[in-house]
């Protein structure tokens, strides 16, 4: 081992030259017992660390970032959340990359209406090669449980035959930033604030579910296919999910590939727990001070 790469071996050696040359070639020296022990300890430590991270992320808490505006006004692009993994049980989708190590669903429970959940999107339709339709993690709000009937009429959700109260409240305004620029806000909704800064302004409402749980939603305009739907009956083992930004959310109101249809309970990965960071996207790597000015500090620590 090591001699074939040592140029000194190519010279005519004497019987005693080889051990002398080996002693002088650091690359040819065998590891000492201490070095081997340290290397093995490092490998064992890294394996243990990887196992701890795998278990923690799969079964306790995992991070999640918000990539789109479908959950405005509650969640902004650039928000980072912790998601609790134990609320609804575990399935293969609880594990990184959906590794099929868990058969079916264990310790399962049904979410409550109004919960904000992270789930794995349905598999793309056969022949669908659009990368946007690849399975990925998504966040939406639970509106319907197994057996519920749901319909949207005139932009109002009808749950089990009764309209969910929808109260008009103050407009939702959001500054235009690199994370949410003019391409995300149509010209009809662009405005300026008191300081003359560009903002996006949407009509905002408060919905209140049976039992008193409430949350804010946006209604940008009248869109017939989103605001006036057929009657849905949620199948057993599934839930009906909607984005809070009702006119800009691909959710259970629409079948794939436009939406997602009903979501099987086993695809739910966890429940949104708390925001741990938020950025408006203006940070630059070569300007460290912008790492702080870009942070939306007031959003850190907001719970659900």
Where are these regions (language model features)?
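Hydrophobic membrane-insertion alpha-helices, especially the h-region
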Residues: 41-61
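Soluble "head" domains of membrane/secretory-pathway proteins
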Residues: 2-39, 60-65, 70-304
